[in-house]
Amino acid sequence: MPNPIYLAELNEADYPRVREKDPTLPETHRAWLRGADERVQILRGRGKNPVRYPIRFRAFAERNDVLGIPSFDQAARDDYADEQGRAHTAAL
C-alpha cells in the first residue's frame, strides 16, 4: 500500500519528493497543485495544521476538476489515506 500523502506536501517544491514515496501519482499538474495550495491556505486560516490532513484522492480530484488523472480512481487509496489520518490523529 502507498504511504499517505498529506495536503501540506502538495506544492511544486515538495511534489517530486512526494512522487518518490508513491510513484503511481501523476506527474505535476499545476491545477491540482494550485487546488492543494488553496486548501492549505484555507486550513491555515482556520487555525488548522494541514500536515495532519491526508488527501482523499477521489474527492480532492472531483473538487478540483482533475478527474482525468488515472491514479485518483482508486477507492482503496482513499480508504487507506482515511485510515492513516485517523491513526495519526489518534496518536497525537
Regions found by a protein language model. Name each.
Residues 1-92:
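N-terminal low-complexity, charged segments
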